[in-house]
Amino acid sequence: MKAAEIREKFLKFFESKGHTIVRSSSLVPGNDPTLLFTNSGMVQFKDVFLGAESRPYSRATTAQRSVRAGGKHNDLENVGYTARHHTFFEMLGNFSFGDYFKRDAIHYAWELLTGVYQLPKDKLWVTVYHEDDEAHDIWAKEVGVPVERIIRIGDNKGARYASDNFWQMADVGPCGPCSEIFYDHGPDVWGGPPGSPEEDGDRYIEIWNLVFMQFSRDAQGNMTPLPKQCVDTGMGLERIAAVLQHVHSNYEIDLFQALIKAAGRETGVSDLTNNSLKVIADHIRACSFLIVDGVIPGNEGRGYVLRRIVRRAIRHGYKLGKKGSFFHRMVADLVAQMGDAYPELKEAEQRVTDVLRQEEERFFETIEHGMSILESALADLEAKGGKTLDGELAFKLHDTYGFPLDLTADVCREREVTVDEAAFDEAMARQREQARAAGKFKMAQGLEYSGAKTTFHGYEEIVFDDAKVIALYVDGASVKEVRDGRQAVVVLDHTPFYAESGGQVGDQGVLANASVRFAVSDTLKVQADVVGHHGTLEQGTLKVGDVVKAEIDAVRRARTARNHSATHLMHKALREVLGSHVQQKGSLVDADKTRFDFAHNAPMTDEQIRRVEEIVNAEVLANAPGIVRVMPFDEAVKGGAMALFGEKYGDEVRVLDLGFSRELCGGTHVHRTGDIGLFKIVMEGGVAAGIRRVEAITGDNAVRFVQDLDARINAAAAVLKAQPSELTQRITQVQDQVKSLEKELSALKSKMASSQGDELAGQAIEVGGVHVLAATLEGADVKTLRETVDKLKDKLKSAAIVLASVEGGKVSLIAGVTADASKKVKAGELVNFVAQQVGGKGGGRPDMAQAGGTEPANLPAALAGVKGWVEGQL
């Protein structure tokens, strides 16, 4: 049974049991800032399990794309060298949110494994938590698993409830026992059952984990039964495929074999058991899907992990003798294997290929540069008879140039040199400590809230007359009242205030009644459906239970809406002008502007910017209505709605049709495109490799910008005594005149310098047969100084000359030495002798050198010392 069929049968089986098939979420978690990557099926349901989010179903099943590389869950170094470690894997799962519990979960698992997949019952073993009699009895008395194949696992990790068979989301919160299902490969494979001394062998392989969220654990370790008991299960597709395809390594399944063959083809290696081919096959999956989900190779966070995986794959190709780009060509092979299951991969194929190709080219330049540094260091080491490469140098190669330690070690090994890995590790530890202190991925600081949700009315209304205060916070702590002058967060049962989300800033405004006035400076989400109004109480005392009138700043909201709607039109226009590879990578929409980051590999041309402006303003002039519909996510995407990579969407989504644009969006927008008024791009630039940024303005801001620009053009035209329409022509004429005058001035300076040069020749002093001259040439530029030095060298025959000029508080110096004298007197040393005394430095050839300085007051003394310096050289 092929992997694709196994995946499909799993999802269809649970669909037949009343489960909703939920698409895989992004590898970039949308609801958990503590995670680098989605690493299990339950991540997208975390808020559901915590009660902070509701879904329209109580049963779900998924095939979740997952990555474990970087952070707490990091399998990277084991990948390719063990049978079951991967950076990327698919987790098949079924979930119950307060619906069924242990009995159904266990029966479903058994039915799928033995009925649908037809695994022999006598090959299956199970484990349960040692206190979970309920699960034990279901397995033994209802399913019929012999008790000798049901193993109770106790607290085997050194503390109460610290067990392989007891799951907990965190130190506090939902937790519960779990039951794992193992497959027995038979006595021909070494290993013992779980819980035995030989459990690390390969005979008994865990294939499925059933987690029963049964309790809530408090800070003191007390367990309280959850009001809604939940189920979270996970079965690795690669592991179950290995079992069903009768192989002992995940790399032998059909999906991996196709990719390993592709790696062999690209590297010219015929031995398909080579571990480096396994590494490459694994890494093409992780890299491609991370790029699909919007991650770009970079130097920090997720981008750094992606870059590390890409470079590890390239390095293994390099070890196999592949000295040029190859990795990006495997994207097509991956699409052939997984494109049907994940259409987003197929759609992004060209973009993924381009990103990987660019990263490869960049890294091969790194390898060449790193090899040059390493070869030089090894040559020095060999000359000294050393046999150990400095670990600090190895770390510098790794940290500064991206040169992997194992590649450094491989090169050294060929020279019978070892790397001081202890020093390398010490340097690495210092860097990790610095990174840890920087805390790139810290737990989001939130407010503890367990009350009612906030009903949002802001799409239709800007005022809500009877909003009830249901919670108050001061300095992060819940309070019953807030007094005049205090900053606080107010939670209402109803609000027209939009909470910051999707790049759009939160509303500002006022909460008030007859005795209270609270100025709202920002609006943020406390939870998915709970809105916090942040601000200052300007009058009265505000209490929980008070009723207030909630009114937003309507002018600010209207300006923000114009900018947000313009962003949608601009996104569509950018895709038309630059190509369908353009994907949003970030945005900020406020009352002043829209800032939009997108994937594109080159600066936009003036013509492309102009074309985008034309397209957007044509949509504005069309004055098309904005139409909002709520529908299932899959229906929206099938209907052409653009979903943004990395955004978290529910199963019901809000679709905005605005002119020629159709996007999923929960923000606030104009009623018609004409409300935008005018659209103008004011900035375009790069923010990272492969990421461009555009800033644009709309409405009255755009009108003021154009008026200001018009005023500046008129002022410039007046200065040049031209009509605004003739400004370009007039500027060209002025530039031509300036060039002509500069040419005349240069000729005059040269002529003047030549005449001064004739006079200066008579000032030369002969020292040891060499004419020495050090003088200032008034009004001369560097070019004139150089020409004069050349003429003086011809005239004086054997000479050492320094000429200087001063302009704008800066010193220019030229030194010239004739060929016969340059064996002893070097022009570079001569010019530096003078430059150091006038606050500068310089250099050049033995016969001609240039320098500058910033201390002209010291110039006379410096020139006076030239004769003695030259005399010392002779």
Curated annotation (Swiss-Prot):
A Pfam family: tRNA_SAD
EC number(s) on file: 6.1.1.7
Top EC class for this record: ligase
Keywords: Aminoacyl-tRNA synthetase, ATP-binding, Cytoplasm, Ligase, Metal-binding, Nucleotide-binding, Protein biosynthesis, RNA-binding, tRNA-binding, Zinc
Database matches in CDD domains: AlaRS_core
GO biological process, one term: alanyl-tRNA aminoacylation
Family: Belongs to the class-II aminoacyl-tRNA synthetase family.
Official protein name in the record: Alanine--tRNA ligase
Annotated source species: Paraburkholderia phytofirmans (strain DSM 17436 / LMG 22146 / PsJN) (Burkholderia phytofirmans)
Taxonomic lineage from the root: Bacteria, Pseudomonadati, Pseudomonadota, Betaproteobacteria, Burkholderiales
